[in-house]
A protein has these predicted regions:
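Conserved AMP-binding/adenylate-forming
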Residues: 1-46, 346
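Structural core segment of the AMP-binding/adenylate-forming
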Residues: 3-4, 31-88, 387-389, 402
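AMP-binding/adenylate-forming catalytic domain of the ANL superfamily
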Residues: 405-427
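Gly/Ser/Thr-rich phosphate-binding loop
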Residues: 184, 189-197, 206-265, 279
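AMP-binding/adenylate-forming catalytic core of the ANL superfamily
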Residues: 43-50, 60-62, 195, 282-287, ...
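Conserved pre-ATP/AMP-binding loop-to-beta segment of ANL
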Residues: 84, 92-109, 116, 121, ...
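Short hydrophobic alpha-helices that are characteristic scaffold elements of the AMP-binding
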Residues: 27-32, 53-54, 154, 163-167
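Conserved AMP-binding/adenylation subdomain of ANL enzymes
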Residues: 128-145, 152-194, 204, 208
């Protein structure tokens, strides 16, 4: 990098899947004080171009092809001048650079729910401290074998995998992209002891037909998931020490996290204390607001978006719903913007999703609000079923009706094979904005 003229403070983009090359470039950029700009491998040419221009990237390191995507052709299309195919990289001479804790380490582009994503600016201090605090909470040991499901181009991969494993000296295991069958095979073969991920990733693992024949060595990790999924993770994957976690890119990412020594029921319910030095408050609208050392410096070259992200007194607006108990433990209850109103009654999708997930046949559940002439909005649910189980739309709606007030019962429900084509991101999250758009078309609304 230094031979290419890259120096302290220069943004450098990385476009490639998980692997040793990504890690080498990330660590190298950090050593010379450069700022890594991870590029989502699912981005199209115009999205890559936007990120490069918005961040002011001085160079782009890429692999020529991945998943039948011709990145070389994309880069030629956008005409970026300093693009380096990693297969052509040669070893250079390293000149030490003095890097400060407050220097930028990463510009993380978020999953865009509007026209384009925003570049979250994170420092060495915020990411390393977050990785250390999270690793301490889940009890990482030097002898652990930690399987990372998350893409390195997200903070769940960079902070909570690449940096966490470096700090604690454990073995990091990963795959170029997540696929349940390959992940289960890797977990068994590498005797992994820790794993992390969101609800969708764990549901895909637990719902796969290969799970019963795999001999897993898992003891813990962390999961961003609701109570039904947390209980299943403990019972079906044997992760007795699994911890609940909540965070967002703008917070480096984790805000609260269980301790592996917390009582099991607290961890299942997702009741977790903030990381040391992080403060949380709940607004009148029940929004989670945060401040402390892990919060972003702002959005890259976007002062208007940065100003809107904070309250007048300096708290980060998360856009998430939550509540604090008397012990100061947070329970996240869904996205504020995902709440919909049925005849004047507020419905949080997470409430209905938890009921659907309690059905023995349901693997994954996602609920969105869709227009209704009489009630304003009604619920629309998409579910996947566990391997070997059967259920009809009518049975699942009846299941919810028996357990929820009528206004919470979905008026539409569709059983699907997966969410890959209707809203799932590369990090395994389901974007409800895209899922809602799909529902409007599918049901002619």
């Amino acid at each position: 990098m230094q031979a290419l003229g890259i120096g302290k403070g220069d943004p450098v983009a990385i476009l490639m899947p998980n692997g040793e090359q990504w890690l080498t470039l990330f660590y190298a950029a950090a050593l010379i004080g450069a700022v890594t700009v991870p590029v989502n491998t699912r981005f199209k040419a115009n999205e890559i171009d936007f990120g490069l221009k918005k961040s002011g990237a001085k160079a782009l390191f890429y692999v020529d092809r991945f998943l039948n995507i011709d990145f070389g052709a994309m880069i030629r299309e956008i005409g970026f001048s300093t693009a380096i195919d990693v297969s052509r990289l040669r070893q250079g001479k390293y000149t030490p650079v003095k890097v400060q804790p407050g220097d930028l380490l990463l510009i993380q582009f978020t999953s865009g729910t509007t026209a384009y994503p925003k570049g979250v600016m994170l420092t060495h201090d915020s990411m390393l401290r977050n990785a250390w605090a999270a690793g301490t909470r889940i009890g990482v040991l030097p002898g652990d074998r930690y399987f990372n499901c998350r893409p390195f181009f997200h903070v769940g991969g960079s902070t909570l995998s690449a940096l966490m494993s470096l700090l604690f000296g454990c073995c990091l295991v990963t795959l170029p992209t997540f696929e349940a069958r390959a992940a289960l095979e890797m977990l068994e073969r590498e005797r992994c002891t820790l794993i992390s991920g969101n609800d969708t990733i764990f549901q895909m693992l637990m719902g796969h037909e290969d799970l019963p024949r795999r001999k897993l060595s898992l003891r813990g990790g962390w999961a961003a998931a609701g109570p039904q999924t947390m209980r299943a993770i403990i019972d079906r994957l044997g992760m007795k020490s699994v911890c609940a976690a909540y965070g967002l890119s703008e917070a480096s990412p984790n805000v609260v996290m269980s301790d592996w020594r917390d009582p099991e029921e607290l961890r299942v319910q997702g009741l977790a204390l903030p990381l040391p030095g992080i403060e949380i408050r709940i607004s009148a609208e029940k929004e989670i607001q945060v401040r402390g050392w892990s919060i972003m410096r702002g959005y890259c070259n976007d002062p208007d978006a940065t100003a809107k992200a904070f309250t007048a007194d300096g708290w980060l607006r998360t856009g998430d719903l939550g509540e604090l108990n008397v012990e100061g433990r947070l329970r996240m209850a869904g996205r504020l913007k995902d709440v919909f109103r049925v005849g004047g009654e507020n419905v949080a999708p997470a409430e209905v999703e938890e009921v659907l997930l309690s059905h023995p046949a349901v693997e994954t559940a996602q609920v969105v609000g869709v227009p209704n002439e009489r009630l304003g909005e009604v619920g629309c649910a998409y579910v996947t079923l566990r391997s070997g189980f059967q259920a009809t739309q009518e049975q699942l709606i009846a299941w919810v009706r028996q357990r929820c007030a009528n206004f919470r019962v979905p008026r539409y429900l569709k059983i699907v094979h997966d969410f890959e084509a209707i809203g799932m991101t590369a990090s395994g999250k389901v974007q409800k904005t895209k899922l809602r758009e799909h529902a409007l078309k599918e049901f002619g609304l």
